[in-house]
Amino acid sequence: MPSHRYRSVFDRVEVPLTDRTWPDQRFSAAPLWVPVDLRDGNQALAEPMDTARKTKMFDLFLRMGYKEIEVAYPSASQTDFDFVRSLAVRDDIPEDVTISVFTPARPELIERTFESVEGLPNVLVHLYTATAPAWRDLVLRGSRAEVLALIEDAAGLVAKLADQRLGTKHGPGAGRMRFEFSPEVFNLTEPDYVIEVCDRVTEIWDACADRPVVHNLPATVEVATPNVYADQIEYMSRSLARREHVILSVHPHNDRGTGVACAELAVLAGAQRVEGCLFGNGERTGNVDLVTLALNLHAQGVDPMIDLSDIDAVKAVVEECNRIPVHVRHPYGGDLVYTAFSGTHQDAISKGMAHHAARAAELGVPASQAPWDVPYLPIDPADVGRSYQGVIRVNSQSGKGGIAYLLRTHYGVDLPRDFQPGFSKVVQRATDEHGREMTPQDLWELFRTTYVVPGEDGAWKLTDTAFQEIEGGGHRVEATAVRADGTVIPVAGIGNGPLSALTVALAKAGIGFEVVDYTENAVYSEHAVSEGADAVAVCYIRARVEGREVWGVGMDTSVLTAMVRAAVSAVNR
């Protein structure tokens, strides 16, 4: 690889901060989130959104609770312009929601932008110009002084048009139009120059308590580790003039795959506002993902102030509008992010879920309100509208814990601990053979055919079975043993209990049968393992049959019948 062609970020831009304080900070509240999907995200789409798709996404933002939404680049296309105009005639936009529009520092484009927002009550005009050396030299073809003059003229025109729109500078509604400035490619711009530019814009726009200025500092192309960006943000936060009247904003991209980390460290460093896109759409590798950022806070006990309680509904709208699928492994929202295939993970999750339910009961609160501490699941999937059905799925990598969890949660069958390893091997052979995932229904059918069916149809059957309690607390059983070849053997036995009596009876048929372990549990009707019954007994017998240790399982509404079937299953297996 020709790595010698590239320079370290420290050779490209000065990073003057040495006494950083951001590493000692902690999150205590969410910043202002600003979705830019309708502008920055939209311009990165192969098929930009039409008005219908834009409207659908805008309505999603309102439902989620965003208070500032960048909606368009009105001077870039008639579609964007028309969309802003469509918002101006709506009467259902909440009064506390601000509409942001984006414009380059060119007079005719600024004027077109102001035309688009006529009639909108709460507007943020977002002005941008690239300030980094390569952009100044190659794109703008201007010196530092010339680019500063360009920005001053543009900021002055924005202020002038705003005053004209509002009637007088301090007249009624003057606080309802605010301004934002982005020194594009901030992270590669000389610190002294970006301070000079931003302070001049602050002065021209006369930042004050009633109308604070947003200075948005983009990592337009991510070029360094997140700590470098945090240093740059803290330096700006400590150096900007009228800081109390400046809302410091960040706009990270994800070229190095660390956009989320950049945004989080930037907030610790003083940023109060974050621009990004849902699920990280945007140019090249995308903008920072607002969903991940919000739920990272949620997972730390901080209210993100955004409603993601139905993440699949959010994802569906985003996928429809962007026409780009969300990856199955995307943090929090992917189809597989709450799913475990690994046996060790499944076992830990299964135990963690059982502990969580028990703890909630102990605290006397619903499980949805109990403190969450389940291995491998950073948040409760239910918090974002996911069910637990997909948490554990079975393939060739799965173990006994996951298999037992699925049968318990889907069918109410509580496999004895000592039973699980044997069934796990049965599942392993099946998954190795066909190489695909096993659904809960597949597991259930495999369980039935392996353990239950042999007790109902096999080399031996017991018919006409009748148990009787006899004097002294003992039990007597009479039955007919039928072999597959048609041989009929009447049998009977007496023992301390029904199972010991059955053992004696089987011996009368020439079957050496010794019980090693016996377990039973009830499966209730909501699990639907049978039709029309309130509860079904499931009996598990581990027996030594003709010297070989095997498990048998029986199911019936009668415990005694289930026990007999379990014994016959063990014999036939």
UniProtKB/Swiss-Prot annotation:
Pfam families: HMGL-like (PF00682), IPMS_D2 (PF22615), LeuA_dimer (PF08502)
One annotated GO molecular function: 2-isopropylmalate synthase activity
Tagged with keyword Cell wall biogenesis/degradation: no
One GO biological process term: L-leucine biosynthetic process
Annotated pathway: Amino-acid biosynthesis; L-leucine biosynthesis; L-leucine from 3-methyl-2-oxobutanoate: step 1/4
Matching PROSITE patterns: AIPM_HOMOCIT_SYNTH_1, AIPM_HOMOCIT_SYNTH_2, PYR_CT
Enzyme Commission code: 2.3.3.13
Cell location: Cytoplasm
Transmembrane segments: none
InterPro entries found in the cross-reference section: 2-isopropylmalate_synth_dimer (IPR013709), AIPM/Hcit_synth_CS (IPR002034), Aldolase_TIM (IPR013785), IPM_Synthase (IPR005668), LeuA-like_post-cat (IPR054692), LeuA_allosteric_dom_sf (IPR036230), LeuA_N_DRE-TIM (IPR039371), PYR_CT (IPR000891)
Domain (Pyruvate carboxyltransferase): residue spans on this chain: 31-312
UniProt binding sites for Mg(2+): D40, H251, H253, N287
Chain positions covered by the region annotation Regulatory domain: 454-573
Coiled-coil residue windows: none
Source organism, top-level taxon: Bacteria
UniProt keyword Transferase present: yes
Oligomer and partners: Homodimer.
Protein family according to the UniProt entry: Belongs to the alpha-IPM synthase/homocitrate synthase family. LeuA type 2 subfamily.
Matches recorded under PANTHER family: 2-ISOPROPYLMALATE SYNTHASE, PTHR46911
Name of this chain's protein: 2-isopropylmalate synthase
Originating species: Catenulispora acidiphila (strain DSM 44928 / JCM 14897 / NBRC 102108 / NRRL B-24433 / ID139908)
Upper taxonomic lineage: Bacteria, Bacillati, Actinomycetota, Actinomycetes, Catenulisporales
